[in-house]
Amino acid sequence: MKRDYYEILGVARNATPEEIKKAYRKLARKYHPDVNKDDPNAAEKFKEINEAYEVLSDPEKRARYDQFGHAGVDGNFAGQGGFGGGAGINFEDIFSGFGGFGDLFDMVFGSGRKARQGPVPGDDIEAVLELTLEEAVFGGEKELRVTRTETCGHCHGNGAEPGTPIITCPTCQGRGQIHQEVKTLFGRMVRSQVCSTCRGEGKIPKTPCRECGGSGLVRKTRSITVKIPPGIDHGHRLRIAGGGEAGRFGGPPGDLYVYIKIKPHKLFKREDIHLKLEKEISFVQAALGAKVEIPTIDGGTEILEIPEGTQTGTVFTIKGKGVPVVNGSGRGNLYVTVKVVTPTKLTERQKQLLREFEEISKQKEETFKEKFNKFKNKFAL
């Protein structure tokens, strides 16, 4: 038994056309055979989804379905019901020869004369956009070159050379499907399949378009403007609706997914919303303390006070000079790690001063030891 069309698309019976279209696009993209090549059930699910959408997206067919159920839209209903074994009989041929009865048959049971494929959404495509750290931090707009399938502008997608007619397919005589009589255990049956010449359309261009060869589609490389939100990070993905491949049979285009790649920076390293920087200071600055200029991602500088006695590896925080929160407020911090640089080339005067410094340090250490020993001996038992 066929599943309910509303159930297939996951929508309520009073769903709006927009809700039905949205549900269809999501499911069609999920179960498209090209995306699920390893899933043997994907093609059948995709066919089921298209069948449901073809009925529910058409106001007339939807009304018949709501009133009669599947019988109101199933063109094979008469052949499956109580009209006999159907040996060698094609009911649509019978009813089509009786004028108004053919129209009545179509109205009640749906026309099986066309195997036209339902609207097929275009495929999604992916691209990589490389940014500098500054571009990622502050956002903006950047151009991206993308190659994709588009509707042919020369023939506007109908596949015919402008000024030439669209004719009835000579293979299927406009039915969109080919009928073959086959022998089965139950007698002779009529089997239908989509016409390969017109792909179920029932019509073909008399003179194929010189630009697209009759397919209605062409490959184009376009420059697309991508809006970069401030604070975007490496690996983030941006979705550009309708930026993908063109749809077929009136289907909507797919989407473009842009993956962000951030170039390494010569000064800063990023961790989430924070930036890190290593700053070299001299031995004297570390020992005596100093005020040093720290570059920021904004392009300016901040004054950092180095207290006397600072050791290598000490981390200082400059608040609010990191990365903005994506789609939020506030910024991270800039963490500065100091590295005390030991001098490698000293003058004799500098060496002498360091020796004097070392001697004074030793004297202080010896004086401290003497005082400590006297204190210890005084209270010794």
Swiss-Prot record:
Binds 2 Zn(2+) ions per monomer. Its main location: cytoplasm. Its cofactor is Zn(2+). It comes from the Bacteria. Zn(2+) 1 binds at residues 152, 155, 209, 212. Keywords: Chaperone, Cytoplasm, DNA replication, Metal-binding, Repeat, Stress response, Zinc, Zinc-finger. Pfam families: DnaJ, DnaJ_C, DnaJ_CXXCXGXG. PROSITE patterns: DNAJ_1 (PS00636), DNAJ_2 (PS50076), ZF_CR (PS51188). GO terms for molecular function: ATP binding; heat shock protein binding; unfolded protein binding; zinc ion binding. Participates actively in the response to hyperosmotic and heat shock by preventing the aggregation of stress-denatured proteins and by disaggregating proteins, also in an autonomous, DnaK-independent fashion. Unfolded proteins bind initially to DnaJ; upon interaction with the DnaJ-bound protein, DnaK hydrolyzes its bound ATP, resulting in the formation of a stable complex. GrpE releases ADP from DnaK; ATP binding to DnaK triggers the release of the substrate protein, thus completing the reaction cycle. PANTHER family: CHAPERONE PROTEIN DNAJ (PTHR43096:SF48), DNAJ HOMOLOG 1, MITOCHONDRIAL-RELATED (PTHR43096). This is Chaperone protein DnaJ.
